Design a protein with these regions (language model features):
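Short secondary-structure boundary micro-motifs
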Residues: 13-15, 74-75, 109-112, 151-152, ...
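Short glycine/serine/threonine-biased micro-segments
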Residues: 110, 124, 131, 141, ...
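An internal, acidic/charged active-site-proximal segment
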Residues: 147-206
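Short, solvent-exposed amphipathic alpha-helical segments in soluble enzyme
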Residues: 107-110, 184-186
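Generic recognition of flexible, low-complexity loop/linker segments
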Residues: 27, 77-82, 111-115, 123-126, ...
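Dynamic "connector" segments at or just before major functional cores
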Residues: 1-107, 119, 128-139, 144
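Structured alpha-helical segments in the cores of large, soluble enzyme domains
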Residues: 118-131, 144-159
Length: 206
């Protein structure tokens, strides 16, 4: 489970804080009272099991969690199969973005096409879900990146880390580039995508 996962991750670093305690509170907080990390820390002191870390440790742990993201996702997927049957025959993929109240670009926070039509720098998030609507894997990319380019790398990660090879990928028209369609028209993979009737050839319209 998560305690064992955090213990194994901690062996590769020299930090002194309890990663499992922090990650547990972040998960509780996201479910019970989704808010900032500061608010999550303040709210966690109201829980029966008191946190054994300081606010600064939450912020420091975020870099570790980001570096270990792929490992965490793969481990959680494998562990989840012991509890429920994961329906991975059909995978749904979509992208969204998040804005930041900052005045200039910084790292992955870049000016791009905001889903909320805001002028702020954004980061892009891509997410795969299984047939039950349970998250499978996600990726974070710069806000100025074409979201079509995010599908293939994350899908390759799923095939490698999750050992999946046979599935149908469902996307909207915005993610259905020719390159993505060709990639998912190979081996035991296939795809379903939305298609504008107006853009179809006349013979297909008929």
């Amino acid at each position: 489970g998560i305690p064992t996962l955090c213990k194994n991750i901690s062996k590769n670093y020299s930090f002194q804080y309890d990663l499992n305690s922090i990650l547990s509170r972040l998960i509780y907080g996201r479910i019970l009272f989704p808010s900032s990390k500061l608010s999550c820390y303040e709210q966690s002191t109201k829980l029966y099991e008191q946190p054994n870390f300081e606010l600064q440790h939450i912020y420091r742990s975020l870099d570790v969690l980001a570096k270990e993201s792929d490992n965490i996702q793969a481990t959680l997927y494998k562990n989840s199969k012991r509890i429920i049957k994961r329906k991975t025959g059909v995978l749904y993929y979509d992208c969204t973005n998040y804005f930041f109240d900052i005045d200039s670009e910084d790292g992955s926070k870049q000016y791009g096409v905001s889903k909320e039509h805001r002028p702020n720098p954004i980061v892009q998030m891509g997410l795969f879900m299984d047939m039950s609507g349970i998250p499978l894997a996600f990726c974070i990319n710069p806000g100025n990146q074409n979201e079509q380019l995010s599908l293939k790398p994350l899908e390759q990660q799923i095939m490698k880390d999750f050992e999946l090879s046979k599935f149908v990928v469902c996307t909207d028209a915005g993610l259905s580039s020719e390159s993505n369609r060709k990639f998912n028209n190979f081996g035991e993979r296939s795809f379903i995508t939305a298609q504008s009737i107006k853009k179809l050839n006349n013979n297909l319209k008929e």
